[in-house]
């Protein structure tokens, strides 16, 4: 269906941005911010823990009180905004705070994607999971490849392109009806 195609495009865009971010953030912190590898490890550990906590606490609350499609739209926009803030901020603390916000929203976004797509599948889980994994793989490969090629051209370019890709995915997602998943629950 149209909504399923939109969601698969969103998955591809999300994994493009996420992988581009993951491929670039370590180099950016070390090369541009001149912070040591021990800081990078500590930062990534803190970010992972915060994402885990956000996923455990906010994802069930948001899903309980709001329609999943609407939450997914808002979080998709927040992902684009947080990446955009990373581009704008020259201050190290503000840049890293934006990175934390991005990864926290990303950790909430993944279960929402999976839930919406599962509900849109109409019981055809096996083949749909194959298509879902292909969408993820396309995003991961292209995100990593592009980030690697363009980082030397501009160290914030991977974040900029990721912000734009996610913004385009948000715009594509706008026509989705917020009730689209409720009528498809098996």
Which residues does each predicted region cover?
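Intracellular juxtamembrane helix-capping segments at the cytosolic ends
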Residues: 108-121
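Multi-pass alpha-helical transporter architecture, strongest
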Residues: 162-186
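Helix-loop junctions at membrane interfaces in 12-TM secondary transporters
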Residues: 87-98
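Helix-to-loop junctions at the C-terminal end of transmembrane segments
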Residues: 54-67, 151
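Structural signature of the two symmetry-related core transmembrane helices
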Residues: 70-85
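A late C-terminal transmembrane helix in Major Facilitator Superfamily
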Residues: 124-153
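Conserved extracellular-gate-facing transmembrane-helix segments in secondary transporters
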Residues: 13-22, 106
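Short amphipathic helix-loop junctions that connect adjacent transmembrane helices
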Residues: 23-39
